[in-house]
Curated annotation (Swiss-Prot):
Keywords from the UniProt entry: Lectin
Organism: Neurospora crassa (strain ATCC 24698 / 74-OR23-1A / CBS 708.71 / DSM 1257 / FGSC 987)
Gene3D superfamilies, sorted: Cyanovirin-N
InterPro entries recorded: Cyanovirin-N, Cyanovirin-N_sf
Keyword Transcription: no
Protein family (similarity comment): Belongs to the cyanovirin-N family.
Coiled coil region boundaries: none
Designated name of the protein: Cyanovirin-N homolog
Length: 111
């Protein structure tokens, strides 16, 4: 299940050049679990674009931010300025519902 519909207090933190997603996720039994997931394990930077299945996007990003409920659909959007091969930075975003889900109170990649 997309994590955002079963999450509370979703946020990111950048620590030691890694971007970590945190939230309280509802388990199948209805209880809540404090969960975290290192987004650099599943998101990379491919010439200034987010790349699913890549790694370490934080190393070539600046101004990383997260909006847990953006727009009318209240989607969790990760935004950053990503460096391309020429050293230029570009504003990019990715909808985390497309790549991260809640499996019984734990974050899991969809691929």
């Amino acid at each position: 299940m997309s994590f955002h519909v079963t999450a509370e207090d979703a946020r990111i933190e950048v620590r030691d050049n890694r971007t970590i997603l945190f939230a309280r996720l509802r388990r199948e039994d209805g209880e809540w679990n404090d969960a975290s997931y290192e987004l650099d394990q599943i998101i990379g930077n491919n010439d200034g674009h987010f790349q699913w299945g890549g790694q370490n996007f934080t190393e070539t990003a600046e101004d990383i931010r997260f909006h847990p409920k953006e727009g009318a659909a209240e989607q969790p959007i990760l935004r950053a300025r990503l460096r391309d091969c020429n050293g230029e930075f570009h504003d990019r975003d990715v909808n985390l519902t497309e790549i991260v889900e809640n499996v019984n109170g734990e974050f899991q990649a969809k691929f």
